[in-house]
Design a protein with these regions (language model features):
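Short, conserved alpha-helix that lines the donor NDP-sugar binding/gating region
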Residues: 63-75, 163
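Short beta-strand-to-loop acidic/aromatic patch adjacent to the donor-nucleotide binding site
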Residues: 79-99
Length: 268
């Protein structure tokens, strides 16, 4: 599609640089993530920087809006020349608890391609999701589909909404090789509790998820209409204070504290 055509070409002649964006909320810790992922990226020769988007308000967690917040903060900082970050040619939207299975020697060949520059379609590193867990895509394509929707509060469906946008572009994500065996998911305790709570009778989280499922079904036919008015361009949360820079497994992690209180229709 013409609106997505620019996302299929290279941005520059330099080796591509990856921004790893990790949406989270305290007290979640990045200790294990930093111990495991950065050494893998260095061994693979991937130029990268890691960013955490930390939700600091009391609203339900909003993974998609947090990624939009980080992407916008990076773009704004680069335009204002507030940091010496390079242009990030591609992005890995990365769950905190999912990693390549380096201990499995038979996975070495598959893992080599996981975080490489996705010149064509995005790459998803989750065996049971169309766009969740870990999604690697070009920055230009993320902008072309207007990023994530901002309206999926709590658990679920923001990744499927993004899939509809990418499919509309003609670039639905493809699964990485052998991700069922070669990506490890160490589900956090809070995540397991949240998933259990979804099934409880009268659960607010469960009711919210059912509302998300209805919204998603309503968007299937015309994702373009919705993505123009809900996404990166309409994000109106805020970064609270300056970013924090900390060591992360031999790399650096930059944390943006994000308040989503300004988003229209927050937590509906």
């Amino acid at each position: 599609r013409p609106a997505c055509a620019a996302a299929g070409t290279a941005d520059n002649d330099e080796p591509p640089t990856l921004a790893v964006v990790v949406p989270l909320r305290a007290p979640a810790t990045v200790a294990e993530f930093c111990a495991r992922l950065p050494p893998i990226l260095r061994r693979l020769g991937v130029r990268h920087h890691i960013f955490a988007a930390n939700q600091v308000d009391a609203l339900p967690f909003n993974r998609g809006a947090l990624v939009n917040a980080a992407f916008k903060a990076l773009s704004d900082a680069r335009r204002a020349r507030r940091h010496d970050w390079p242009r990030f040619d591609y992005v890995a939207v990365h769950d905190l608890d999912r990693f390549p299975a380096e201990a499995n020697a038979s996975c070495a060949a598959s893992i080599r391609g996981y975080y490489s520059f996705p010149a064509g379609a995005p790459r998803v590193l989750h065996p049971n999701s169309f766009a969740g867990g870990v999604l690697v895509l070009r920055s230009a394509l993320y902008r072309a589909v207007n990023g994530f929707s901002n309206v999926y509060w709590g658990y679920g469906e923001e990744d499927n909404d993004l899939f509809l946008r990418l499919r509309w572009c003609g670039l639905p994500p493809r699964h990485g090789d052998a991700v069922d065996a070669c990506m490890v998911h160490d589900d956090c305790a809070a995540c397991r509790k949240q998933k259990r709570d979804l099934d409880k009778k009268g659960s607010a989280d469960g009711a919210r998820l059912r509302g998300h499922e209805e919204r998603l079904r309503a968007r299937i036919a015309q994702p373009r209409r919705h993505m123009l008015h809900d996404g990166l361009s309409t994000f109106n949360g805020s970064v609270v204070g300056p970013p924090r820079h900390e060591p992360c497994g031999g790399s650096t992690i930059t944390t943006f504290d994000i308040s989503l209180a300004g988003i229209a229709g927050a937590a509906t």
